[in-house]
Amino acid sequence: MVEADHPGKLFIGGLNRETNEKMLKAVFGKHGPISEVLLIKDRTSKSRGFAFITFENPADAKNAAKDMNGKSLHGKAIKVEQAKKPSFQSGGRRRPPASSRNRSPSGSLRSARGSRGGTRGWLPSQEGHLDDGGYTPDLKMSYSRGLIPVKRGPSSRSGGPPPKKSAPSAVARSNSWMGSQGPMSQRRENYGVPPRRATISSWRNDRMSTRHDGYATNDGNHPSCQETRDYAPPSRGYAYRDNGHSNRDEHSSRGYRNHRSSRETRDYAPPSRGHAYRDYGHSRRDESYSRGYRNRRSSRETREYAPPSRGHGYRDYGHSRRHESYSRGYRNHPSSRETRDYAPPHRDYAYRDYGHSSWDEHSSRGYSYHDGYGEALGRDHSEHLSGSSYRDALQRYGTAHGAPPARGPRMSYGGSTCHAYSNTRDRYGRSWESYSSCGDFHYCDREHVCRKDQRNPPSLGRVLPDPREACGSSSYVASIVDGGESRSEKGDSSRY
């Protein structure tokens, strides 16, 4: 049974678009006093063709409906009927008018139709309409719309396809993101160290002296034993030369990244022809020089710098040493051989520098900046001396170090004071004099090597190089025998 919304409320539909509230009030006011006229308009403020009129007296409303229904108003036939509440019956599936937001005459009209079609219920005006309290068929539409979400809602709540799809996609996205992040992070890790290393190595290489053209060995790596060995002079019966001391050298090199391996020092050993020291010392110097920066040059590199002169083996020696010690001034300690090399080896003394290599290297550990006495010598010779000038300098060194005698007692290269070397009579002569008051050296200081004073020459089995010669800070004396005179020269090796 249809329920009226408001007894005095009428729905007027089919109005002309040009009809306004004043016209409606003038026409319907004849039937009785009107409390409200509501013309439904669109957003552009144009009439949508229907309106609601409320009479103060319900009887007047009934009379107006009977009188005005089906009549023409402004050229169009209008429909007037009692406004009714919209029905909630599911059977009535009439499509409400597009204007469902506000109370609309079409709503009441359709409601009336619904009532004729057998619809049983109406929505209360409070529920179905806005402020005006009139009916609107739109409520049914809104209700149907509500049903649609209700139907869809359960599927979504129950985890329908859309949620499922979205969830996997999210998971996939997260997985892909994680995957991409993982590789990216790995890439970052892999590429971090090499550049640094590259920069560090390049820095080291740059700091290396220009004398050595990129012969530096691996950074922080000691040259392989084979590498140093390859350069060792062929032994002619001096089998023991480096063998005995090589171990020490190697140990010392192990202790410090900067120390060369024993073999490396070995490589610089002179070829035992009597002039081995020359090349040997020289190459040593260069090597230690290059090594001054954790980069160590191959023995070959140092070797290339060795002067080939046979007669002045010692000179070249000291000279090369100096350079080497210079290079080592940076963190590199001259190998024991390095310092040793500066001593003039005698032809007969196979052990010549080989024995000393280990000691020199140990001494090099004690102090980083001072290479063998050769550093001072090498510097003086390399920078200031050439040809015969070497001899002079070496002779001067001889006074401090003493000339290397041929077969006599071997000269000890140790000595707290480099000036203690006075006896240099035989140069290549028959007896070796102790170069320094200290044959055995102890390295206490980077700058200064503490040694025990040994005035006596070391036994043939072992000759200990003067750590001061190897690392002496204040002066280096190289003994060189040339023409029967011993020459000594003081060099300041503590420049670094």
Curated annotation (Swiss-Prot):
Q: Which superkingdom does the taxonomy of this entry point to?
A: Eukaryota
What GO molecular function terms would the record report? RNA binding
Q: Which GO terms describe its biological process?
A: mRNA processing; positive regulation of mRNA splicing, via spliceosome; RNA splicing
Q: Which GO terms describe its cellular component?
A: nucleolus; nucleoplasm; spliceosomal complex
* Segments of this protein annotated with the region Disordered: 67-348, 453-496
UniProt note on tissues of expression: Testis-specific.
- Per UniProt, the ranges with Polar residues bias are 175-184
Keyword list (alphabetical) reads:
mRNA processing, mRNA splicing, Nucleus, RNA-binding
Domain called RRM: residue spans: 8-85
Q: Where is the composition biased (Basic and acidic residues)?
A: 204-214, 242-253, 276-289, 313-326, 335-348, 484-496
Instruction: Note the subunit structure.
Output: Interacts with splicing factor proteins SFRS3/SRP20, TRA2B/SFRS10, KHDRBS1/SAM68 and KHDRBS3.
Extra facts: The RBMY1 proteins are encoded by repeated regions of the Y chromosome, mostly within the AZFb region. The exact number of functional copies is unclear and may vary between individuals, and some of them may represent pseudogenes. The proteins are very similar, which makes the characterization of each protein difficult. Thus, most experiments do not discriminate between the different members. One can therefore suppose that reported interactions with a RBMY1 protein involve all the proteins.
Q: What does this protein do?
A: RNA-binding protein which may be involved in spermatogenesis. Required for sperm development, possibly by participating in pre-mRNA splicing in the testis.
What is this protein's name? Answer: RNA-binding motif protein, Y chromosome, family 1 member E
